[in-house]
Amino acid sequence: MTHQPQQSPQFFLTAPSPCPYLEGQQERKVFTHLVGDKANEINDLLTQGGFRRSQNIAYRPACEVCRACISVRILAGEFEMTRNMRRVWSQNRDLIGRVHKAQPSTEQYALFRDYLDARHRSGGMSDMTVLDYAMMIEDTHVNTQIIEYRRRGPDSFMSAKGDGELIAVALTDVMADGLSMVYSFFSPHMQERSLGTYMILDHIERARAAGLPHVYLGYWVEGSRKMQYKIRFTPQEHLGPRGWQRFEG
């Protein structure tokens, strides 16, 4: 009898490099490739185990001395907006989010570059070309989608042709137990809208509507100001040695 080899993922470890979140720390990552007809199933399992996806790679921190990166997921069904979040939601009621296949566009890239140049000029993604951006969006074997946020036009209820300018984008994986926000960006010239917060709130509502219990936000890094926003969306769960544990803030 001939046995077909199982499509088990192989894991690799990166060399140490400077941590982008905590000064003076070194980071290492364990990663595997998400390829083949089991990629979607493997991505679900790994995300539930604290991994994140970038293109066709799933990774998680494997640092030698630091454990500051904590996987976070929102309990969508129990979530209630704070007063400030309700204000953000109301302030963006003129927006419409449309779901598309994970395909890049020149309009998306222009917004992406505007976002990076204004907010992450010295970050690791600052030199990404249009080809790099295209690979980030479409180089995947998993169930993912693009959500484009635009101002509603007078005919938006009939057709997307009536929508206004593109002001925010989210790349989102659709999993068996939730939505995973892989990457999002927005116009840096509309700070009063709090678009980052709005997109998370919108994903919570989308998860609820689809009957999905979780919205995965990636890593909260204690001590990193840029990651502090993630723990405002409660109740949520944090992944630790004993599995997912409830966190109320």
UniProtKB/Swiss-Prot annotation:
The keyword Cell inner membrane does not apply. GO terms for molecular function: arginyl-tRNA--protein transferase activity; leucyl-tRNA--protein transferase activity. Its EC number is 2.3.2.29. This is Aspartate/glutamate leucyltransferase. Belongs to the R-transferase family. Bpt subfamily. One of its GO terms (biological process) is ubiquitin-dependent protein catabolic process via the N-end rule pathway. Keywords: Acyltransferase, Cytoplasm, Transferase. GO terms for cellular component: cytoplasm. It catalyses: N-terminal L-glutamyl-[protein] + L-leucyl-tRNA(Leu) = N-terminal L-leucyl-L-glutamyl-[protein] + tRNA(Leu) + H(+); N-terminal L-aspartyl-[protein] + L-leucyl-tRNA(Leu) = N-terminal L-leucyl-L-aspartyl-[protein] + tRNA(Leu) + H(+). It is found in: Cytoplasm. It is an enzyme of class 2 (transferase). The keyword Membrane does not apply. Functions in the N-end rule pathway of protein degradation where it conjugates Leu from its aminoacyl-tRNA to the N-termini of proteins containing an N-terminal aspartate or glutamate.
